[in-house]
A protein has these predicted regions:
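Transmembrane and membrane-interface helices of multi-pass
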Residues: 2-6, 10-227, 244, 253
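Intrinsically disordered, low-complexity N-terminal segments that are enriched in acidic
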Residues: 233-234, 238
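Helix-hairpin-helix/helix-loop-helix acidic hairpins
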Residues: 230-232, 255
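Beta-strand elements within well-structured catalytic alpha/beta cores of enzymes
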Residues: 247, 254-259
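Long, well-ordered, tryptophan-enriched scaffold segments
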Residues: 239-245
Length: 259
């Protein structure tokens, strides 16, 4: 029997889940994040031409989350997987509500500003938007609900060897590199995925082209390491342009008039 990542306890003992459960555990979060991204983008009516970008990044992030829920005891694995699944699904729903009410998505860096704006003053509007958004919120939460109800029977949440979790992290790295390759393909337009990946502005375009989860990850990254390329960097030298009539001081013959 091939190595499936589970700890062996006694020779000849049969793994309770087998290869199918192993694959289900590994692919649980990649499948969930791809589902959430596709449902999110279809509902928000974004350009699906960028789906290859955020699908690959979703798979990479999914492998990372799967690795976090593999090497612990059964109860800890189960609790971690269910909490992560519900939390991430709620984040997608919350961003839809934020876009509906505030006409923009909100990353972690904007939470302080949002708190300062006393959002409680808009509690009625928020409550109304949440009620109207219940159908899409339930669709987003559906996989997490099924995981909470039937996850123990379907995937088992058995403890896997730490080395196997390391292999899953390796898959995360491979797909992340693949995602960077897709980002740097020759996409059309002024704001391409490659440019948006380096920015800390244009969050709506980032969400559309890079995906919601990648945008939020980049927002956290840029809170620690400031972005090098923003929209403002294209115009930072405008203030150094010479005003009318100052060209004569530059030594340009065209700027001087002989008397």
């Amino acid at each position: 029997m091939g190595y499936n990542g589970k700890r062996s306890r006694g020779s000849g003992r049969r793994d309770d889940g087998g290869l199918n459960r192993t694959m289900a555990r590994v692919l649980l979060f990649p499948a969930l994040l791809v589902y959430l991204e596709l449902v999110f983008h279809i509902y928000m009516k974004t350009a699906l031409v960028y789906a290859p970008v955020y699908v690959v990044f979703a798979i990479a992030a999914g492998f990372f989350l799967s690795a976090l829920t593999l090497p612990w005891r059964r109860q800890a694995n189960s609790l971690a997987a269910k909490i992560l699944a519900v939390l991430i699904s709620v984040i997608y729903g919350a961003e839809i509500i934020a876009k509906t009410i505030l006409q923009s998505y909100y990353g972690p860096s904007a939470l302080k500003m949002a708190a300062g704006n006393k959002l409680t003053d808009y509690s009625d509007v928020i409550a109304s938007a949440v009620v109207r958004g219940i159908p899409i919120i339930l669709i987003l939460l559906l996989p997490s609900i099924l995981l909470c109800l039937f996850g123990g029977r379907l995937v088992g949440f058995a403890r896997f060897d730490l080395r196997f979790a390391g292999l899953v992290l390796g898959a995360c790295v491979v797909f992340h590199i693949l995602g960077l390759g897709v980002v740097h393909l020759p996409w059309k337009g002024d704001l391409t995925p490659a440019k948006l990946y380096q920015m800390d502005t244009n969050i709506d375009d980032q969400v559309e082209q890079l995906g919601l989860l990648t945008t939020l990850r980049l927002d956290v990254k840029h809170m620690i390491v400031p972005a090098k390329n923003t929209m403002g960097s294209d115009f930072e030298d405008i203030g150094n342009l010479a005003p009318n009539g100052s060209s004569s001081s530059s030594g340009d013959p065209a700027g001087s008039v002989s008397e």
